[in-house]
């Protein structure tokens, strides 16, 4: 019975995801599914994650797998292959989750990052390395001073170094995660990593606003991908959209309105800087 219930839950979640993608794909460049929200349901949840990745690719969206992997050696290589690469069994080649980017934890150093960089070079895909995360306690480690400099800045320098090994046309395949809730640090890190895309979580539900984000972008207005999760997928719960007639039944319409508001907020802030 429990397996049937989980299967039904994943079927509902799959339809929910598709409805939001259908309502927003023409407005956005990328999506960032968080794998833990699927893994908690076991095999059925992982299958729903894969369906979401595949459907987003059908809509020509870049898929950033929010997986935060971090290990060393063959294990790190297996993570990199599973999310971004291909595995060969006998004469056949298979892809795993097949995201375009994956988030990676740098705590284990180069031993944990190099296997991902190798796969990025081979597959022309990318990673976002956790540098300064949006959560309140991130400073417990990330703000610690080493020879007078914060750890997040030193990690940013390593991101730039690793990224120099695998450049695309204008940006590296190695990007960074820097939270919208720390705009001053974002300004510093943008200068440290001028050729890296910055993935910016923390917009919306965590308090980030367009005016906080301008320094995450380069002078040409490019180089950052701003992420809003709950603010979009649960927009129908917000009073501002309820006042516009949004209900749980038309949740996808509320998500579209939230995306439009987000675009206007960020574009307006960039125009005024």
Model-derived regions, located:
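Single conserved hydrophobic/aromatic residue that forms the stacking wall/gate
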Residues: 1-7, 11-12
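Acidic (Asp/Glu)-rich catalytic clusters
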Residues: 21-28, 53-58, 117-122, 190-193, ...
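Hydrophobic faces of well-ordered beta-strands that scaffold small-molecule active sites
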Residues: 31-33, 63-65, 102-104, 127-131, ...
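Active-site beta-loop-alpha junctions enriched in small/polar residues
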Residues: 36-38, 68-72, 105-107, 132-136, ...
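Conserved anion-binding
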Residues: 71-175
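C-terminal helical cap(s) of enzyme catalytic domains, especially alpha/beta-barrels
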Residues: 213-219, 234-273
């Amino acid at each position: 019975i429990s397996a049937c219930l989980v299967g039904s839950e994943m079927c509902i979640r799959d339809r929910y995801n598709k409805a939001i993608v259908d309502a927003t794909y023409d407005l956005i460049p990328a999506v960032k599914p968080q794998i833990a929200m699927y893994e908690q349901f076991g095999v059925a949840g992982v299958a729903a994650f894969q369906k979401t990745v595949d459907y987003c690719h059908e809509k020509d969206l870049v898929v950033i797998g929010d997986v935060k992997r971090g290990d060393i050696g063959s294990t790190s290589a297996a993570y990199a292959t599973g999310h971004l690469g291909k595995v060969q069994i006998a004469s056949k080649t298979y892809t795993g989750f097949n995201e375009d980017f994956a988030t990676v934890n740098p705590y284990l150093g180069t031993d944990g990052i190099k296997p991902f960089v190798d796969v990025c070079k081979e597959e022309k895909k990318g990673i976002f390395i956790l540098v300064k995360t949006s959560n309140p306690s991130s400073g417990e480690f990330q703000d610690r001073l080493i020879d007078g400099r914060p750890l997040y800045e030193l990690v940013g320098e390593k991101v730039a170094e690793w990224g120099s090994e695998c450049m695309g046309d204008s940006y590296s395949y190695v990007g960074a995660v820097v939270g919208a809730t720390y705009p001053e640090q974002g300004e510093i890190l943008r200068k440290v990593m001028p050729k890296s895309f910055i993935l910016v979580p923390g917009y919306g539900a965590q308090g980030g606003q367009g005016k906080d984000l301008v320094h995450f972008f380069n002078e040409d207005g490019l180089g950052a991908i701003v992420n809003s999760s709950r603010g979009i997928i649960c927009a129908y719960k917000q009073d501002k959209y309820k006042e516009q007639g949004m209900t749980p039944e038309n949740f996808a319409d509320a998500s579209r309105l939230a995306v439009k508001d987000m675009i206007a907020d960020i574009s307006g802030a960039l125009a005024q800087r």
